[in-house]
Every structure is written in C-alpha cells, then in structure tokens.
Regions:
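Non-catalytic terminal/accessory segments
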Residues: 1-278
Length: 278
C-alpha cells in the first residue's frame, strides 16, 4: 500500500476523490506486488492497492454484489456472504455420498490469467454504464510495482485487490451455470435398480417371517428366527441398490474460488467424457 490508513483519511481527501471520479480524472495507482507462501511450497503473488484505490474498489464491490449476488449458483462458495470453505464441505458431505468417481479441478494461475475482454463482455450482459466500464478498464490496466519496477497488466485481476474476488465469481459463474445445465443433460434415471442379491435376501426374510407367523412349534420357531437373523446379517453387508446400474447417472458439483470438485455416479468412461467436455 501507500503507507496511509483509511482512519487517517480527511473529509477533504474524500471529497477530492469523489470529484476525480465525477470528472473521470481519477487514475488508480499500480498495485504493490508481494508474495505469500502456499501450502505446496510455492509463492502466491498478491497485489496490494493504495488506500484511495481500496476505497473506490470497495464501492465497486458493493455495487457488483448488489447486482450479481442473487444470481450466483448455490454451488459457489468462495468470497460470498455467509459462505465459506466450511459450507462447501457441508455441501460435499450432503450431496456426494453416493458418488463413485471424483474429478478435482484447480484453475492454475486463475487470477493472473482472467481475460479482460471476456470479463468486460460478461459484465456488459448486466450493466450498461460507459463511465463504469471506463473506470473498470483503468483498474484492470493499472499494472503493478515489483522491486521498484513497473509492470503492465495485460490479463488478470490481482489477488489482494478488494474487487478481485467478486470479479472472479462473476467470471466463474459461467462455469457454474454450465455445470448446472450439464448435469441436467447428464443425469439419467429416477432411481437405481435394486441389488438382486439384496432383493433375494429380502424375499427369504419375508417368506420365513410369514412361515414363522403360521408356526406354533417352539423348536421350529427357533430355527426360523435364527435363519431370519442370519439372512438379515448377510443383507446388512450388501447395498440395497445396484451401484453399477447403467440406467442411473448423476453428477454433483461444488466450487470454492478457483477450486472445484465433481462427484460422479456413473462409469469411468463417463468421467473421462466429463473431463473432456469441461
């Protein structure tokens, strides 16, 4: 940052900032690039904006959140109100229980590689304000300072910027909606077929139970009860449905920031097809 704090910002400075925004003379400063360690041992670049830029970005973030938050998919959990990695894990725990295959995705270098033209095109689908877009272009092209050297930005939105998370969600909302539509096309069957072996044990238990009701002899009743218990014990170790039923397919999807996971009820070839399509 520029070493200044919002607490120390005077009313006059804020008024000057508003005037600069009104006459479009406002020019964001290059972000200060720093690095923080990642879990895998690599370093993650952060772009720290100036105090003035933080303030303006926060206003833009509030505007974008008011426009887009209500239309984001329920499968998106990163950088959203009342959502977190914990809500993402809860959704996985709740919806992925029957999944047999998993596809994990991590969009490498996502924040640094967001296509500016594509991003602006997505924003223009909902926003019609030329002044807004002129300001947005200024932020996207502001560049960054690293080791006292200025670097231009041709793509991406810097991690560390207040506006970057919601821009990322707006960008990746296209993926979320694609996966929602993909699931509608992929899913097949109302329910899985019953496991034939499970069904056979159930029929035996029913038949023995019927016979038990009709039997008075104590020794015979004991034999029937023991047989029923044994069949119930054997059935407990079996799934009630056919887990390899080709007539039943489902796909589940959850995203947190630029990481996503897909759970698949289907075949290995189904998974390979999904990877190709994505």
């Amino acid at each position: 940052s520029d070493g200044k704090t919002i607490d120390g910002m005077s009313l006059k400075r804020i008024e000057n900032l508003i005037d600069a925004l009104k006459d479009e003379s406002y020019q964001p400063k290059p972000a200060r690039r720093t690095y923080i360690p990642k879990k895998n041992g690599n370093m993650r670049p952060l772009g720290i904006p100036s105090i003035d830029d933080k303030l303006v970005q926060e206003v833009l973030r509030m505007l974008l959140e008011a426009i887009y938050e209500g239309s984001f998919e329920n499968t998106s959990h990163g950088f959203r109100p009342k959502r977190s990695c914990h809500t993402a894990l809860i959704q996985v725990q709740k919806n992925f229980t029957a999944a047999k295959w998993f596809i994990e995705g991590d969009i490498e270098g996502f924040f640094d590689n967001i296509n500016h033209d594509v991003l602006i095109g997505i924003l223009k689908e909902r926003i019609a304000d030329d002044r807004f877009f002129r300001l947005m272009w200024k932020f996207l092209k502001a560049g960054y300072i690293e080791d006292w050297t200025f670097h231009r930005t041709y793509s991406g939105t810097p991690q560390g910027g207040i506006i970057s998370p919601i821009l990322a969600n707006i960008y990746l909302d296209k993926l979320d909606k694609y996966m929602k539509e993909y699931a509608c096309q992929f899913d097949r069957g109302d329910r899985r077929a019953m496991n034939l072996e499970y069904k056979r044990y159930s029929r035996k238990i029913w038949w023995l139970g019927t016979k038990l009701k009709q039997t008075k002899d104590k020794d015979t009743r004991k034999e029937l009860i023991d047989a029923i218990k044994q069949h119930q014990k054997n059935r407990m170790h079996l799934p009630s449905v056919d887990e390899m039923d080709e007539g039943y397919r489902r796909i589940k999807y959850v995203r947190y920031a630029d990481d996503f996971i897909i759970g698949v009820i289907g075949s290995k070839s189904d998974c390979e097809g999904i990877k190709e399509d994505i």
